[in-house]
């Protein structure tokens, strides 16, 4: 058999040291999350500033086996950090070589459904395989800080810093991974199809904008050619909508699962896009390589990545433009968000979907157009994905190292909080709208590394509100008019929550625990900047901001950002258990501790911080 280029690269990657490094990382994140989420309860032996964790298991002969590792419980949300290799102890000690063996042995002691365990093991093994290839191919010709925003979207290859199956991409074969994985920067052509209006719809009240985006994205000449093709099939172009499709989705899912629709001309293949596109970190969002200022295109992908199926739910596609319009109006009427912080909303301004109400194809054919960040960048401004702020070069150097050295850690950190974090909190406190502001949903706009402002994105599934806490309830969209799923849904299913605590949990979980907290780790581990000091500065800047808005005092207190503990999502547990009452666990809040320390510091110096 003749080996192709991809096959040769894969063999070299697996034989390299990168395979061992990636396997160690996946196992480390796996053990950290299992302990942190309380899925396993190892014995703990305190040893100076470290903890020796002893994890019990049973081998296939039901003989006792122990896994050992050293780590710490962090100030930042009580997160667990494993600092040593993880070794298997049974007739001697040996570093773990197999994710499958570790989980099989540990879960003979802890009960879990075998099919769920097998599925999770597969995700982890695929993550090791696919990240090994990415790390082996990693390009270090330029430092990260020398790269543009678009380049960073492709070069930030490390994936989720907490989730252990951060690069599973279940559905992609190895050639698919090379062709469509964002790390490999292969340009692709979108597939355009015509979809009959009996099953195809545009976003709610979005027809005019949809027509405009088609002319812009396809071009009038090509649009006419597409209409002629529909005519030649004996159909009326006025009865069809045009939808861009990811080429992998077309080849591997649409053709086989929509064969009946293709046969009866419910779907008509039109051709490839003129422009080239390239995947961003989220995989299903594509940037226009030919014309970078043109919109990003978010399309359905029937792959499982970071434990989530990357399709687009029809109801969320339907409401996407309305949500962006709502948020845009809110920001435009808030002088702080509009003029002072100059927050950028990358609006999801148009959308289209095809839905036959069949379970097997649900969410598999849809598109959302989102504004490009390049549309907003001013002179001398550049941008970096927020998760890039806690990423590292291959040698372990933080990519923000040069910026910290140039501006000083405290000065740079305070600016970051003022320009990027405070606007998200202000939106919750002033307006009652919480965004899922994790690392991929935020973009820092900077000038030579100095934080300037924040761009926020991906609103169609990442927003929550508690109706009694909305500043202007009458401005909130009526989602029940937009899609039948909303009309048939209940509280907490979508955007509307039944308690104000949900807004608090969204901010503490998405913004701080799994996003800003990672930056606290980088500063602590690489620069010996204490986590306590980090969170004290965060609290100082939050309170400095809200002192300027005394009318928000009661609303700020209602959010209870300084609660001693809160309930965080269990990302790993949800891969192992389905029939459980709750997939959250109680964790300590570093903002509470930091505020207490700030009060003590103020009292000691004769201040009145506690009365602020």
Curated annotation (Swiss-Prot):
Ligase recorded as keyword: yes
Annotated pathway: Siderophore biosynthesis; petrobactin biosynthesis
EC annotation from Swiss-Prot or TrEMBL: 6.3.2.-
Coiled-coil regions listed: none
Keywords annotated in UniProt: ATP-binding, Ligase, Nucleotide-binding
Outcome, altering residue 461 to A: Increases relative acceptance of spermine, norspermidine and 1-aminoethyl-1,3-propanediamine
Entries under InterPro entries matching the protein: Aerobactin_biosyn_IucA/IucC_N, IucA/IucC-like_C, LucA/IucC-like
Top enzyme class: ligase
GO molecular function, one term: acid-amino acid ligase activity
Effect of gene knockout: The deletion mutant cannot produce petrobactin on iron-depleted medium. In vitro analysis show that mutants grow to a very limited extent as vegetative cells in iron-depleted medium but are not able to outgrow from spores under the same culture conditions.
Pfam families with a match to the protein in the record: FhuF (PF06276), IucA_IucC (PF04183)
Family stated for the protein in its record: Belongs to the IucA/IucC family.
Alphabetized PANTHER family for the sequence: L-2,3-DIAMINOPROPANOATE--CITRATE LIGASE (PTHR34384), STAPHYLOFERRIN B SYNTHASE (PTHR34384:SF6)
Subunit structure as annotated in this protein's UniProt entry: Homodimer.
The protein's name: Citryl-spermidine/3,4-dihydroxybenzoyl-citryl-spermidine:spermidine ligase
Record gene name: asbB
């Amino acid at each position: 058999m003749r080996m192709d280029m991809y096959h040769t690269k894969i063999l070299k990657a697996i034989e390299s040291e990168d395979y061992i490094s990636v396997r160690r990382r996946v196992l480390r994140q796996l053990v950290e999350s299992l302990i942190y989420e309380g899925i396993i309860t190892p014995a703990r032996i305190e040893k100076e500033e470290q903890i020796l964790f002893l994890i019990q298991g049973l081998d296939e002969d039901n003989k006792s086996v122990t896994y050992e590792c050293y780590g710490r419980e962090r100030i930042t949300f009580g997160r667990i950090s494993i600092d040593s290799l993880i070794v298997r102890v049974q007739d001697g000690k040996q570093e773990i070589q197999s994710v499958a063996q570790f989980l099989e042995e540990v879960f003979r002691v802890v009960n879990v459904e075998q099919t769920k365990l097998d599925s999770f093991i597969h995700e982890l093994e695929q993550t090791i395989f696919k990240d090994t290839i990415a790390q082996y191919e990693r390009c270090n010709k330029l430092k990260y800080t020398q790269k543009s925003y678009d380049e960073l979207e492709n070069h930030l290859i490390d994936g989720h810093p907490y989730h252990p199956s951060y690069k599973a991409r279940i559905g992609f074969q190895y050639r698919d991974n090379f062709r469509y994985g964002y790390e490999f920067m292969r340009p692709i052509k979108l597939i355009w199809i015509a979809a009959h209006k009996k099953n195809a719809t545009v976003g709610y009240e979005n027809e005019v904008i949809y027509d405009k985006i088609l002319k812009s994205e396809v071009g009038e000449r090509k649009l006419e050619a597409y209409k002629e093709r529909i005519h030649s099939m004996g159909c009326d172009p006025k009865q069809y909508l045009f939808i861009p499709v990811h080429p992998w989705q077309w080849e591997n899912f649409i053709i086989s699962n929509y064969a009946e629709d293709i046969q009866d001309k419910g779907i008509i293949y039109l051709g490839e896009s003129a422009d080239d596109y390239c995947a961003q970190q989220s995989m299903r969002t594509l940037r226009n390589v030919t014309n970078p200022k043109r919109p990003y295109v978010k399309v359905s992908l029937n792959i499982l990545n970071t434990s989530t199926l990357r399709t687009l739910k029809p109801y969320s596609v339907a409401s996407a433009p309305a949500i962006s319009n709502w948020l845009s109006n809110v920001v435009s009427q808030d002088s702080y968000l509009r003029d002072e912080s100059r927050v950028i909303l990358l609006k999801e301004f148009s959308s289209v979907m095809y839905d036959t109400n069949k379970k097997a194809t649900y969410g598999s054919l849809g598109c959302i157009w989102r504004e490009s960040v390049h549309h907003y960048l001013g002179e001398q401004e550049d941008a970096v994905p927020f998760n890039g702020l806690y990423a590292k070069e291959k040698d372990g150097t933080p990519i923000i190292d040069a910026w910290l050295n140039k501006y000083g850690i405290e000065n740079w950190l305070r600016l970051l909080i003022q320009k990027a974090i405070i606007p998200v909190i202000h939106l919750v406190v002033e307006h009652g709208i919480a965004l899922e502001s994790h690392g991929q949903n935020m973009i820092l706009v900077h000038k030579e590394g100095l934080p300037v402002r924040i761009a926020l994105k991906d609103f169609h599934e990442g927003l929550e509100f508690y109706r009694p806490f909305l500043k202007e309830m009458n401005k909130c969209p009526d989602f029940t008019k937009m899609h039948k799923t909303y009309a048939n849904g209940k509280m907490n299913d979508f955007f509307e929550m039944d308690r104000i605590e949900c807004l608090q949990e969204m901010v503490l979980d998405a913004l701080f625990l799994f996003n800003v907290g990672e930056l606290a780790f980088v500063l602590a581990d690489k620069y010996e900047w204490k986590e306590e000091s980090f969170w004290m500065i965060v609290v100082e800047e939050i309170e400095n901001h809200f002192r300027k808005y005394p009318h928000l005092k009661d609303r700020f207190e209602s959010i209870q950002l300084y609660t001693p503990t809160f309930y965080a999502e269990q990302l790993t547990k949800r891969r192992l258990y389905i029939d459980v009452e709750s997939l959250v666990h109680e964790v300590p809040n570093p903002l509470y501790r930091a505020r207490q320390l700030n009060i003590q510091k103020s009292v000691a110096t004769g201040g009145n911080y506690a009365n602020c």
